[in-house]
Amino acid sequence: MEQNLDVNNIRQLVDIAIKVVYFVEDNVSESEVKDLLIKLINSPFDSYFIFKSLKKDVKCDLLLNNNIQSYADIGDKVEKNLQSLNSCIQSLSPNKFNNLKDGFLQKNFPSIFDSNKTKYKEVATKVREELSQLEFDFIRLKIDISKSNQFVDKNLTNVQNYLKAKGLYLHLLIKTWDVLSNNKLSQYVDSNLPQEFVENILYSVLDELKTCCEIIVSMHTSMKIYHQLRTRNDYFLKNIDNAINNAKTVFQQLKDMSSINDEKIAILNNLTQETNDSIQKISDEIKDFKQIKEQQPVVTE
């Protein structure tokens, strides 16, 4: 038995698994342990089916492999849209059109001033159209992320229920192992059994215990993946909300400036400052996003 199963390794797995299912109360009764022992003794070659019938597994419909990749590129889409928004805002700066707010240019070179003003209005119209599309794209991304979060929440619930069932089963196997490995069998059943027979039963219990622990550890890893994905998506939602708010602010500025005339040229002073503030805000958002993205790489299984 010890040549095929490393008992020390199993003990380590048990310690890890117990920590994972710490929330599962050990309420396995002595009668449950006795019932399992009797079944294994009476039908030693049917241990696989005995264990299978005892497992109280909740169906854990983990669609990780099928779905996680469809959400893995959301971060790249968010970053791409933020950069597009940043470019839109930067293109609105009057400084790119020989400073429309420059009174000297307006007074001494009115034709150049009017030409620059026309160019600015043309750019503003184009940017306004781009902002409308960007806002639509951001909203669509929010819908995708919301769907992703629903998927994550469902899987977290499934895994939690799955671990609860596995935790109860784990406690049963641990107690059965304790009985068989510490000469307590006589407290439950007829002890006049060949030692080799008892060792074979112990082997089957240890093998099942090892599998149970490995599954619990694997499910715990899945939970960490889901939590990571959820945290990442929440961060994306924050970035998208900020981006949409900035887009709406600039969009409103463009609406206000669509009827620009000489009397209202001073408004460009405020627009320039607000635009630069928006540029800085978006730049900071992109920088923060990249830092988070580096800390939380896309997870695959």
PLM regions and their residue ranges:
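Alpha-helical scaffold segments that mediate packing/assembly in large oligomeric complexes
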Residues: T157, N161-L185
